[in-house]
């Protein structure tokens, strides 16, 4: 969004509300999910109108899920660069300001807000799972390309829920070893729809703290 084009370390600019965050996640990544759904339906397979609408709805939320996870993971770095994607109206409800997120000791106070967005990210990610599970059985390459980010997203959300994201000395990141393991699992699972569903779930994951 244009509001972040002129940021500097002396000033932290935040999104105002939930609508602006949703607009941002759509413009950066939800629109990408929409675009690739268009490409998939134009070149890979045909579906009826109901299935088409389901794919577009879930494809948009697929993209939003990955961007929201990135936002949650990168909060300290973004704040240090003068950008706060956590809506100001949400922070004010808990007597917080963007600059307070530079202090890892404020995590307990920030946790209710943070967990609410982890839950939202899980809900979006469940739509990503729905998108993959809607693919025809012969689309194993497409399944593989989607399973990978879903599993990395699930692992990242688990780590975010268990750690202090405001601690810049200990950044939250899925290890290379785990990514290699996820790659192998994704490759094997993508061969069939049944294996895929067993690995990534059936879009009913619920975040509970």
Mark where each language-model region is.
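Catalytic cores of Mg2+-dependent Asp-rich isoprenoid enzymes
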Residues: 1-65, 76-209
